[in-house]
Amino acid sequence: MIKQLASASTLALALVAQPAFAQDARTTFDGFYVGGAVGLENVENGTKGLEFDTNRDGTFGDVVRTTTNADAFSPGFCGGQALGNSAVAGCASDNDKFGYAVRVGFDKRFGDVVGGLLLEGANSKAVDYATGFSTTPASYTYARSIDYSIAARARLGLSPGDGRGLLYATGGVAYADIDRAFTTTNTANSFTLDDGGDEMEWGWQAGGGAEILLGSNLTVGFEYLYSKYNDDSFVTVGRGTAPATNPFLLNGGATDLRPADRKIDQHAFRVTAGFQF
């Protein structure tokens, strides 16, 4: 998919490079266009940490207990990446990364109002972390990132005056490849991601932006885009080399764990460029 996005981006740049005389001059947002965007991507940093299903009945929210009925995760949780095997070491924040997107769309002008549809492919490497600390001591970190996404959005905006400026809102559906990874300093138990660490998920997007139509049918602008995806994945903690008295094994022989925040919330702040046909 990454190669496809790169190819589409190259095609878009090639179209932009066409001589101005080969295209009809455009003075308003009305017709087909291709474009791209690049900017900073941020995954919302929650503080909920992890949650557990100790009897694997599908209901999360259980407390992992030791043989003395103490809370095995009493040291606490954080919404970041563990910096050591204990809560004292603390956590790093989620990783913000630069992402890019390519798109093709169509706008129709009705007086000062512009409405349209677009298809977009995007790539992002921003990472969301959720961590828990046990009394062992040991750390358990669940990482999630959006590898790539495909979206179909509508946009509606105002383009008053000479029609060379556009303020718009946008929203629609998205389908994303969510990458997951799990790391821990616990070397006794076994840990298995339920989906192998990679799964497609549906979500939605909403945002807004502004564009200016320059000469030679070129547009530039900026855009904010919010994306939200569901995530039902989890990690199964098995016995490994741990004794039967291990807290993860006491209530059914295994425990499932996952981020307490099941939603993935992403914010993108982009600079855009396009070419109007």
Please provide the spans of the model-predicted regions.
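Gram-negative outer-membrane beta-barrel domains
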Residues: 2-10, 14-277
